Regions:
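N-terminal Rossmann-like or analogous alpha/beta NTP/dinucleotide-binding catalytic cores
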Residues: 2-139, 146
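Conserved small/polar residues in nucleotide/adenosyl-binding loops
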Residues: 150-151
Length: 151
């Protein structure tokens, strides 16, 4: 079985030094180490829309900025596959199938979903896309057969 990394960012704003120190520097190291057979780096625009649906233009513009930041930090398209989540329709399709396997009550018990709902004051009106983003993440992971997720 091949060793595959899946990593990426939601384009909700510009990347900053914290992104570089926290993950981008390590991604470049992993890319150059040749320890992994494949590295997929996703710009998760569909997931960014789950809590930015009111401003899709912001997300679209940030896709470009994040891609430029990736390149300027040393991520190399010859060594890593850089892609935009929404441009892979199979990810949406796989998410749809997975949604039939997960109950609403299970999503409601997810600690991350619970805390994010409270943080964003969504208690009375939770957008479905936001509520189901963990399913989308599972589809991303399984579609690429990732053995390491690096944030």
């Amino acid at each position: 079985m091949s060793k595959v990394i899946l990593t990426g960012d939601r384009p909700t704003g510009p990347l900053h030094v914290g992104h570089y120190v926290g993950s981008l520097k390590r991604r470049v190291e992993l890319q150059n180490s040749r320890e992994y057979d494949k590295i997929f780096i996703m710009i998760a625009d569909a997931q960014a829309l789950t809590d930015n649906a009111d401003n899709p233009e912001k997300v679209r513009q940030n896709i470009i900025e994040v891609a430029l930041d990736y390149l300027s930090c040393g991520l190399d398209p010859a060594k890593s596959t850089l892609f935009i989540q929404s441009q892979i329709p199979e990810l949406c399709e796989l998410s749809f199938y997975y949604m039939n396997l997960v109950t609403v009550s299970r999503l409601q018990r997810n600690p991350t979903v619970k805390s994010e709902i409270q943080m964003r004051n969504f208690e009375t009106s939770i957008p479905v896309g936001f509520f189901t983003y963990p399913i989308s993440q599972a589809a991303d992971i399984t579609a690429f057969h990732a053995c390491l997720l690096y944030t």
